[in-house]
Amino acid sequence: MKAVVLGSGVVGLMSAWYLQKSGYQVTVVDRQARSAEETSFANAGQISYGYSSPWAAPGIPQKALRWLMEEHAPLKIKPSLDPQLLKWATQMLANCQLSRYQVNKARMLAIANHSRECLSQLRQEHDIEYQGRQQGTLQIFRTQKQLIAIEKDIALLEQSGTRYQRMSVDECIKQEPGLAAVSHKLTGGLYLPDDETGDCYLFCQQMTELAQQQGVTFLFNTNVKKVNAQGNQVVSVSTDAGELQADVYVVAMGSYSTALLAQLGITIPVYPVKGYSLTVPITDESQAPVSTVMDETYKVALTRFDDRIRVAGTAELAGFDPAIPEKRKATISMVVNDLFPHSGDFAKAEFWTGFRPMTPDGTPLIGKTPLKNLYTNTGHGTLGWTMACGSGHLLSQIITGEQSENQAGLDLFRYAS
């Protein structure tokens, strides 16, 4: 049995990995020269099982209106009459109801916790070096209102069996000593001990080598021109390297999956939500974060690699605009300077932007399509690195017919109504 996976970001890569473990002869196609050269290249670096939450949440519509007027707001919207964006935004607003938020978050936590198990097993079986740490995430709050609001999430964490610890300001400083000088800016925190960190790009390079050793073929520098269908199934994929034929096909092209599937008359609600990051070399380890610190006010994550800090945040609805405006640089620079001002050489900061493939309800699209041998694994938003291993494993189970309690409600048919 043969499988073709379109896309070699962390989600496509792990789709290929688990398909080959299930006995498939796998070919991966990507337009870049290496794996993870796009959205997976310089993401936040956080593997946030406990922080897996939909952006569509109660109170977000009101917050979004306020953020439009704030200089360092976590959400920016570029005015547009794009019908895809308008439909996507309408669906997102509908998912801000508490009842839908609870369903969506529960699904996301289930995928994330399954992914934790898969990544743990992967580390046990293979010697993978990606500057990974297993020291948790500290979500910090600057207002009493934020402390109170977290209670609704704690109930869902308990329901999913996700460990957590409420922390006072003193406990936050004990967990992250680098915050000591700014303790007066904090009101408390929520610690998620099972969360991890790591350089997604390094992980992908390691996994590409392992996959090649297991027989997976990678066609880099190869553009997908068209997916060809006859009747109710795909018969081939046209690329600039020729035609590819397989028994099953997986679309894992992040935000670019939407346009490709549209050629087949398949509509998916995945829209590019632009994010930004900076990477700064550490000059004083005692002043740097130990693991990941998540600033709830600005929705910015600060993650520790071995000798670097990765700072990532901002959600911008601007289509596929690759520009990095100075205002966006200023926001993420402001947060790291505010919390860890003496940690690194900010003159050497490297900025990056990527397009997160976001669904309106936050849950990815994993599973079947109207064409019987075509599958999707996309729409993970900010949680591709967090959910990649679990998503790849779940997809392989769906394709091979193995049943799992975590499969329900993940495919695109949940948007059919």
Swiss-Prot record:
GO biological process, any: D-alanine catabolic process
Residues the record lists as binding FAD: 3-17
A single GO molecular function term of this UniProt record: D-amino-acid dehydrogenase activity
A Pfam family it matches: DAO
Catalytic activity field: a D-alpha-amino acid + A + H2O = a 2-oxocarboxylate + AH2 + NH4(+)
Cofactor field: FAD
Coiled-coil regions listed: none
Keywords: FAD, Flavoprotein, Oxidoreductase
Homology family: Belongs to the DadA oxidoreductase family.
Name the UniProt record assigns to this protein: D-amino acid dehydrogenase
Organism: Vibrio vulnificus (strain YJ016)
